[in-house]
């Protein structure tokens, strides 16, 4: 585990000691090296998991998420160059240091064995993200977005801390590797139901569940490009990962308690896709599409069958790469037209033909076209949900239909039509941007050849 955490921490002195013209090059190349080192974790010789120490372990559920985290740092650094072009060198270095700190915390969160340690790291990831949003955001509303983000997350996860401390007292240990062998502590009393709610609420706010999702569009819209990427790709996955980990203590309450949340997810899935059709703001549209994808993941985790877990992990990885790519594309538009309104950035296909092909590929991946892993995840989740109840096919079918509609609506609005006059003299597509898009698409395409490496511990 140290082979990932130590180089990541050492990236901070590397960034601060780099010369003015080498900051971006050094941080990008070294973070790519770290992400290549992390690939070795995929080849696990044991069937169960790799125990690095008492503190850290990796199993087939956390490994793909750790690799996604390390893969995203170079992409965030590449994407942020244009955004920070007017900043002083010190501020650039500070910005990169924030991203590196966030990555180190996330790697440790995904590999923590102890639930209290997991909770501390889970909350610690809030701080760098908050600084990114409130310091480097674009509009003045970023402070409002930061408040929403902070209070939603904190209010949601405080009950979890109380319950974890209580469980530490009753069970004697909160080690994830031990907990699964303990006798079940929860009974069918109302206190057990409250405990279940307290444990799940923290992760449902983070996912976010429809109804608790108001912080997400705000935070996404106001965050700088790297903030949006890390929020969509990894911080939402923390919720899913935490839910999968904590449900093993909460047996057998989940089966009886999950119905209202599953109904809310199904309803929210259709509602957020319908909200997407009404959006004028590009970033807001992608943020709401994240909510609808994550609703599928919540459904899958609450059903608790091997297939649904496989679908949830596949969908989390797929969504991480896809939504991150869409945010990068939205950012390239924003850098050229200085507006997130879709109507003001229309007809760009004639001006930026290469970017239009990236837009097409990203939109098709987002609507889960075969052979992408998005399709594999959605199919697995849809099948298990249908097996759980046949009626859900109405909501799921409608969700898939509207997802296709808003993805194509986003593509057509930005790429087709007559372009506006203020876009005559825009900059061409840079190699940096094409590389960025390729580095998002490549894992999606390669994983569709061999998807079993991201299907989680039950494959």
Swiss-Prot record:
EC numbers, comma separated: 7.1.1.2
InterPro entries registered for this protein in UniProt: NADH4_N, NADH_Q_OxRdtase_chainM/4, NADH_UbQ_OxRdtase, ND/Mrp_TM
Highest taxon of the source?
Eukaryota
Q: How does it sit in the membrane?
A: Multi-pass membrane protein
Compartments, record wording? Mitochondrion inner membrane
**Top enzyme class of this protein?**
translocase
The residues that cross the membrane are 23-43, 60-80, 92-112, 113-133, 145-165, 196-216, 224-244, 257-277, 284-303, 308-330, 351-371, 392-412, 436-456
Q: Please give a single GO biological process term from the UniProt record.
A: mitochondrial electron transport, NADH to ubiquinone
Respond yes or no to whether keyword Membrane is given for this record.
yes
Q: Name one Pfam family in it.
A: Proton_antipo_M
- GO CC terms: mitochondrial inner membrane; respiratory chain complex I
Q: Which UniProt keywords apply?
A: Electron transport, Membrane, Mitochondrion, Mitochondrion inner membrane, NAD, Respiratory chain, Translocase, Transmembrane, Transmembrane helix, Transport, Ubiquinone
The GO terms describing molecular function are: NADH dehydrogenase (ubiquinone) activity; ubiquinone binding
Annotated PANTHER family: NADH-UBIQUINONE OXIDOREDUCTASE CHAIN 4
Subunit organization: Core subunit of respiratory chain NADH dehydrogenase (Complex I) which is composed of 45 different subunits.
Instruction: State its role.
Output: Core subunit of the mitochondrial membrane respiratory chain NADH dehydrogenase (Complex I) which catalyzes electron transfer from NADH through the respiratory chain, using ubiquinone as an electron acceptor. Essential for the catalytic activity and assembly of complex I.
Checking NCBIfam families in the record gives:
NDH_I_M (TIGR01972)
Return the protein name. Answer: NADH-ubiquinone oxidoreductase chain 4
């Amino acid at each position: 585990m140290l082979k990932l955490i130590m180089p990541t921490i050492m990236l901070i002195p590397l960034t601060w000691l780099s010369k003015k013209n080498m900051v971006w090059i050094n941080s990008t190349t070294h973070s790519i090296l770290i992400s290549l080192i992390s690939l070795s974790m995929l080849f696990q010789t044991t069937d169960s998991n790799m125990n690095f120490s008492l503190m850290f372990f990796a199993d087939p559920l956390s490994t793909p998420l750790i690799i996604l985290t390390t893969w995203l740092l170079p992409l965030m650094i590449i994407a942020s160059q244009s955004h920070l072009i007017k900043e002083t060198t010190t501020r650039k270095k500070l910005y990169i240091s924030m991203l590196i700190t966030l990555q180190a915390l996330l790697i440790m969160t995904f590999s923590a064995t102890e639930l209290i340690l997991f909770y501390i790291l889970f909350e610690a990831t809030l701080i760098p993200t908050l600084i990114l949003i409130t310091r480097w955001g674009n509009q003045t509303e970023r402070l409002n977005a930061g408040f929403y983000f902070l209070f939603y997350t904190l209010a949601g996860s405080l009950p979890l801390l109380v319950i974890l401390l209580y469980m530490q007292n009753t069970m004697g240990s909160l080690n994830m590797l031990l907990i699964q062998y303990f006798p079940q502590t929860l009974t069918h009393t109302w206190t057990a139901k409250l405990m279940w709610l307290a444990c799940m609420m923290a992760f449902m706010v983070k996912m976010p569940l429809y109804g608790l999702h108001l912080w997400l569009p705000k935070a996404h819209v106001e965050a700088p490009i790297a903030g949006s990427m890390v929020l969509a790709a990894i911080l939402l996955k923390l919720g899913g990962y935490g839910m999968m980990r904590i449900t093993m203590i909460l047996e057998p309450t989940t089966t009886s308690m999950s119905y209202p949340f599953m109904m809310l997810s199904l309803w929210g899935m259709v509602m957020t896709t319908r909200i997407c059709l009404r959006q004028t703001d590009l970033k807001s549209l992608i943020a709401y599409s994240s909510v609808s994808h994550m609703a599928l993941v919540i459904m899958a985790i609450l059903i608790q069958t091997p297939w649904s877990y496989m679908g949830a992990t596949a969908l989390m990885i797929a969504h991480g790469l896809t939504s991150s790519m869409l945010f990068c594309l939205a950012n390239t538009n924003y850098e050229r037209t200085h507006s997130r309104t879709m109507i003001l950035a229309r007809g760009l296909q004639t001006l930026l033909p290469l970017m239009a092909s990236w837009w097409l590929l990203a939109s098709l991946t987002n609507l889960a076209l075969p052979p992408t892993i998005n399709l594999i995840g959605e199919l697995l989740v849809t099948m298990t949900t249908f097996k759980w109840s046949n009626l859900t096919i109405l909501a799921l079918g409608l969700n898939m239909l509207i997802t296709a509609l808003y993805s194509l609506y986003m593509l057509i609005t930005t790429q087709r039509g007559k372009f506006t006059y203020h876009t005559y003299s825009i900059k061409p597509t840079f190699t940096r941007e094409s590389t960025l898009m390729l580095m998002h698409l490549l894992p999606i395409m390669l994983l569709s050849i061999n998807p079993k490496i991201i299907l989680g511990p039950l494959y």
